[in-house]
Amino acid sequence: MNILISNDDGVFAPGILAAKQAVEDLANITVVAPDKNNSSIGRRITLFKHLKINQCSLEDGSSAYSVTGSPADAVIVGVDYLMEEKPDLVITGVNQGINISCDITSSGTVCAALEAVSLGIPAIAVSLFMDPKTSFKQDENGEWYVDYDFTLTKKVLHDLVLKIKNEGFPDSIDLFNLNVPSNYDSEEFKITKLSPKMLDKKVIDNTNEEKEELFNYSLDENQENDDLVMISSTLVQEYDEDTDGYTLIVEKRPSLTPLSVNMTCKDLKDW
């Protein structure tokens, strides 16, 4: 079995190493990912522009490739250029953050998996939901850091890929969207459907009360504060049962959502 692993957080992000470690006993692994963070970039593809490919090493010393492009670019380059044989499966992630609901169309992680499907390869998009109460910690000097605990994510991903290896990918779907909580009550994944949305979004400017907390970000060169706005977001807190959000956030268990790339709505017969 040959597996291509990519992500949108960048080739040196800890999640991509976790994904590799989860399945390296099951298949031959090739890692191809963007050279830097490309979160929320969706399915952008770089057409007719040069992309630089660099061979590099992950933290465990294993070989990987970085691409100066988007997550979808990395998948295309990996499948069509770097791999000798077409992979049997593409895994994208593990994303450092949640990817649920119909908002997944903006996710570089999920859209890289969608790109794999367009190339005729089944895929799994994997994300870690980090509970702010347990994932954000302080060191002995009082400095804050993020504790990326991929333990359960690696176990669930391993078991899922093992099932696919033994039984094949389900014929009726194109890809899986897997989200795993860092703070969990159950290790067993649940088959779910997409929630309507993940984020409540709001535009703020220098006149908003939230500006002191949310508007303090570095300016681009020669950029001034005047006429600047920022899109802020907060995680939706209420979800219907059997959705990915309810399973992940309320029930605190892994959510596995089967997806199809065909967005055709079959309900409309005549209009």
Listing of model-derived features with the role each one plays in the protein:
Residues V146-Y148, E167-W271:
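C-terminal accessory domains and tails appended to enzymatic cores
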Residues I5-F12, D103-I104:
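Short, glycine-rich nucleotide/cofactor-binding loops
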Residues V77, E85-D139:
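Internal, conserved structured core segments that host functional sites
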Residues T30-V32, Y65, I91, P122-V126, ...:
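Hydrophobic/aromatic beta-strand patches that form the interior of the parallel beta-sheet core
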Residues D9, N37, S70-P71, N95-I98, ...:
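Short glycine-rich anion-binding loops that position phosphate/pyrophosphate groups of nucleotides
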Residues S118-N166:
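Phosphate/ribose-phosphate-bearing ligand recognition and processing surfaces
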